[in-house]
Amino acid sequence: MDLPLYWTALIAFLIINAMLLTASVLVYAERKISGFIQHRLGPNRVGPAGFLQPFADVVKLLFKEDIIPAQANRFIHALAPTIMVTIAMTVPALIPFARGVVIADIDVGVLAILALTSISVYGITLAGWSSNSKYSLLGGLRSSAQMISYELAMGTAVLSVILQAGSLNVSAIVEAQRDGWAILGWHVFTNPIGALIFIVTAFAETNRLPFDLPEAEQELVGGYHTEYSGMKFGMFFLAEYVNLFVASFVIATLFFGGYLVPFEPLLLKAFPALEGSVLLGLLQFLSLLAKTCFFAFLYIWVRWTFPRFKYNQLMTLGWKYLLPIGLANVILIALGVALFS
């Protein structure tokens, strides 16, 4: 259904603020989970159980001095973190949070998501170049090479989903996963290879361990944001955690039924009055949120348990393994659609 403009504006306002809050919650969750993995307590001083620690960190960053290197390009140096945050905040507009609840329900939604996530590499590259530092520049170059390499494999995974759904519209892709008994229509069951490739490449696209070569501390000090301080530095971290949550949203939407409630057809058969109700919309939103939180936890767990790839291993995995397997998977899915649809 088409929402009135004022409802769309209200949802957009709520989502932007929710993503800002989510970044803080994810920082807290990461610290607590890493503390658990390493047998530590994690933050436990500011607020109940340390929950307000991320907000204290934001206040600290706001009052820190904003230092710009003497030979840096001041305009681009300030523009780079802005690009990162803006792109990260834009992608959720294309994700349906419940049936009919989406800010921008466009026919080429999947392509728009891929395009927006691709643009974020400009922020990292510009940050590396504008800082006039060899460490920052190397981090920017690494990021460009990494994201270009893994976007191809990610594209093959998305293409296989498009072939299955027969549409580029994100809502249509979610609804296509209603086919099949209970949860067996989800693309993770009908296209497991594509799901695995997309999850792996999503780790690389968000520059998280084991794919965090652009900001490898042991090699590049801080990578592309070595010369950033104050709130500009904080904006990079805000973008990183928003991207983490957005990537989890996209994984859940394309391969795990999105807002579809598990066993939804059986639920509607037992309670027909739920069809089109606000309660069903709330259940769908909570279903999407639960799936997203699971993948956000997976991101954090992998970061604190897996070692970093070497650069040659990173490139080999992308070009020699994921891309050929992804292309073969597209061919198999295309044959399956042609023969059995």
Curated annotation (Swiss-Prot):
UniProt EC number: 7.1.1.-
GO terms for cellular component: plasma membrane
Disulfide pairings: none
GTP-binding among keywords: no
The reaction(s) this protein catalyses: a quinone + NADH + 5 H(+)(in) = a quinol + NAD(+) + 4 H(+)(out)
Top-level lineage group: Bacteria
Transmembrane segment boundaries: 9-29, 75-95, 108-128, 154-174, 180-200, 244-264, 278-298, 321-341
BP GO terms, sorted: aerobic respiration
Principal location: membrane
Record keywords, A-Z: Cell inner membrane, Cell membrane, Membrane, NAD, Quinone, Translocase, Transmembrane, Transmembrane helix
Topology in the lipid bilayer: Multi-pass membrane protein
One annotated GO molecular function: quinone binding
Subcellular location: Cell inner membrane
Annotated signal sequence range: none
Membership in a protein family: Belongs to the complex I subunit 1 family.
Role description: NDH-1 shuttles electrons from NADH, via FMN and iron-sulfur (Fe-S) centers, to quinones in the respiratory chain. The immediate electron acceptor for the enzyme in this species is believed to be menaquinone. Couples the redox reaction to proton translocation (for every two electrons transferred, four hydrogen ions are translocated across the cytoplasmic membrane), and thus conserves the redox energy in a proton gradient.
Subunit structure: NDH-1 is composed of 14 different subunits. Subunits Nqo7-14 constitute the membrane sector of the complex.
Protein name: NADH-quinone oxidoreductase subunit 8
